Amino acid sequence: MKGHKKNENETNIFSKNDINLEDIKAPECFEIERRLKEEMNIPVFHDDQHGTAIVVLAAIINSLKVTKRNIADAKFVINGAGSAGISIAKLLMRAGAKHVTMVDRIGIIEESQEWMNDAQKEIAKVTNREHLTGTLADAVKGADAFIGVSAPGVLTKE
């Protein structure tokens, strides 16, 4: 605009770009994101990871407000240890969640399992503090929230 003097914030906002990654499967998406962040000085957003995690955290925050509960005390089960599930777990923990258990098609993710990819091994170190073992059915016992980001129909009434 003529006569408009840019301030520092406008210069920072409008002079930068970002990278939006879309539909890149795990575990490749984690390595691509990591390398881009290392090599480029711009934000990297992976819709499947970060977009999903943001929406889930918003829903969790609202449900906790309605039920007058604290995120640190709530128990979360995330079914699906791919890009979305891992990112949801990370964001929940950054928001203060202490009790997050992840489940994949083989069962509850534990640090000692050898079949996991690097991203799953990393998240296994900071989740499942109760050292649960077993299946999804075992994981959801006593849980306050179930977050499903895998195949449909895996959670049954039983």
Show which residues each predicted segment covers.
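Short, Asp-centered acidic motifs that coordinate Mg2+ and/or phosphate
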Residues: 18, 144-145
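Short, well-ordered coil/turn residues at beta-beta hairpins
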Residues: 22, 148-149
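Glycine/serine-rich phosphate-binding loop and adjoining beta1-alpha1 elements at the start
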Residues: 1-74
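Rossmann-fold NAD(P) dinucleotide-binding segment
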Residues: 32-35, 39, 140-142, 151-158
